[in-house]
Amino acid sequence: ENVIIIYRSLQKDFFQYLLKLNRTSSQLELYKKADNSVLHKYYSIRSDFDSSNYVMYEEIKSMDCIYGGEKSSTPTGIFQVEGKSAEEYVSGYYPELDQVKFFGYLVIFEDYFIHSDLYASNATKETMQDYEPVSKDDTFTSGCIRVSQENLNWLLENIDVGTTVIM
């Protein structure tokens, strides 16, 4: 059964995708803009209902993820992707090491990102496949949402700055 998100706004420019963190299943869910006719497919709405101020999003994919734990939780709210980069990022938030790297990220809120596994600071984008991620056994993060490198690459290629993220 498809999951539908109905988004109401007077704004007329909507993004093709919407991201939602499902904390229960530890999944980052990806929704794609759908034709408004799906509203009538899933809900009993009167036939003369004007859906022009609504956007329908259908779930198309979900990605395994981990997110913030008790000591540093992931914020709850509705955000927009503020920026994105395919470049490496050096972080000092990992408790066991002074610095770690990840390769590519989407900025959601301040220092809260969607990014991939963490690597030792001597890894590069070209050599990271030769290294074991230092974060491979983690069950939570310092607040960011962490997905696989493959999924992150897909997000970087397809998600625009401004896309809604529900966390």
Locate predicted features.
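Exported/periplasmic cell-wall-interacting domains
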Residues: S72, S85-M167
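Intrinsically disordered, low-complexity
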Residues: E1-T76, M167
